[in-house]
């Protein structure tokens, strides 16, 4: 009886350990996934826009591609408006995934708004705007930087046009905000990057020879994919092994002489990053009222002038008849 109890206790203890380990693995995995999104820049840079005006996403996405932003010319205080970011690309293109296979391109964007502008709260967004937004999830670049918004990566087939719901500030409640013209900056990428934040290459870029010499051996890795290329220096017999991950296509063959930094592979990258800017005016309602009053007074003055002219013409005509 005692033996059965001990066995039961041992089984219970092992099951508890297994459940605990499984939960830890799940938590760690989920954390790593969430930390990888939406963009690596959040982990490495306090501000996504450098003093030179360059957005840091260009450090990893080396190819230059277009991006477009559309915002209203002017907005009133405490108003929700749309900032539309367009990331165009050929929808037929396929990119190299991390496992070396081909797949659709993803897109992502960072929107740098003026201080005081921020993501509109859900209860202020109209149903029409929510429909345009789709199922996108926006977040602040930092908890203390609500004016910088990021989104992605998301499927490019569905979200090559991204609608940001923005709430304009009210200078009456935010004294640091004024009725002025402000710049808005945007960066948008399509496809994976070529360099990781730690400086290492992804498999979505070209690989060059790290030494000059004869390609003495090419070994194809069967399990993970990719190649091991052995380069032999005929002058001293030194051998250099370059590792090529799965994805890029090999351009060299055994027995071929290659130079230092000569491309060993094709460049599989079909995506790229672009940045742009726009301007928006935070308009004072009193100015609009003043402008309307001025226009109304001008119209009334014109009407009075016309009436006065007609009256004068009638007087002249009466004098001539007399």
From Swiss-Prot:
Q: State the Gene Ontology BP annotations.
A: photosynthesis
Cofactors demanded by this protein: heme
Localization recorded for this chain is: Plastid, Chloroplast thylakoid membrane
Q: Which residues form a coiled coil?
A: none
Q: Name one Pfam family in it.
A: Apocytochr_F_C
InterPro entries per the record?
Answer: Cyt-f_TM, Cyt_f, Cyt_f_lg_dom, Cyt_f_lg_dom_sf, Rudment_hybrid_motif
Membrane-spanning intervals of the chain = 288-308
On the tree of life, the source organism's domain of life is Eukaryota
Give start-end of the signal peptide. Answer: 1-36
The cross-references to SUPFAM superfamilies, in alphabetical order and at most eight, read: Cytochrome f subunit of the cytochrome b6f complex, transmembrane anchor, Cytochrome f, large domain, Rudiment single hybrid motif
**Function as written in the Swiss-Prot or TrEMBL entry:** Component of the cytochrome b6-f complex, which mediates electron transfer between photosystem II (PSII) and photosystem I (PSI), cyclic electron flow around PSI, and state transitions.
Cite the record's note on assembly: The 4 large subunits of the cytochrome b6-f complex are cytochrome b6, subunit IV (17 kDa polypeptide, petD), cytochrome f and the Rieske protein, while the 4 small subunits are PetG, PetL, PetM and PetN. The complex functions as a dimer.
Protein name as annotated: Cytochrome f
What is the name of the gene encoding this protein?
A: petA
């Amino acid at each position: 009886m005692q033996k059965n109890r001990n066995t039961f206790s041992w089984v219970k203890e092992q099951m508890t350990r297994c459940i605990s380990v499984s939960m830890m693995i799940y938590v760690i995995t989920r954390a790593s996934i969430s930390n990888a999104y939406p963009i690596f820049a959040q982990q490495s840079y306090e501000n996504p826009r450098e003093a030179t005006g360059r957005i840091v996403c260009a450090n990893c996405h080396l190819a230059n591609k277009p991006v477009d932003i559309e915002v209203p010319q002017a907005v009133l205080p405490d108003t929700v408006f749309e900032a539309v970011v367009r990331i165009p690309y050929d929808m037929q293109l396929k990119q190299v995934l991390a496992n070396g296979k081909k797949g659709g391109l993803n897109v992502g964007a960072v929107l740098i708004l003026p201080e005081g502008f921020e993501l509109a709260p859900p209860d202020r967004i109209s149903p029409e705007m929510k429909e345009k937004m789709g199922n996108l999830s926006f977040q602040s670049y930092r908890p203390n930087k609500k004016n910088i918004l990021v989104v992605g990566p998301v499927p490019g087939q569905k979200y090559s046009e991204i609608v940001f719901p923005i709430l304009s500030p009210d200078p009456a409640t935010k004294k640091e905000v004024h009725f002025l013209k402000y710049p808005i900056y945007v960066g948008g990428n399509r496809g994976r990057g070529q360099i990781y934040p730690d400086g290492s290459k992804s498999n979505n870029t070209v690989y060059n020879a790290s030494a000059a010499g004869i390609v003495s051996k090419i070994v194809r890795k069967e399990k993970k994919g990719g190649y091991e290329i052995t380069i032999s220096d005929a002058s001293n017999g030194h051998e250099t092994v370059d590792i090529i991950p799965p994805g890029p296509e090999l351009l060299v063959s055994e027995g071929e002489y290659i130079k230092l930094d000569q491309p060993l592979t094709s460049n599989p990258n079909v995506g790229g990053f672009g940045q742009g800017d726009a301007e928006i005016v935070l308009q004072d309602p009193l100015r609009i009222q003043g402008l309307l009053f001025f226009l109304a007074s001008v119209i009334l003055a014109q009407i009075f002038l016309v009436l006065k002219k007609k009256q004068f013409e009638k007087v002249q005509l009466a004098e001539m008849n007399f």
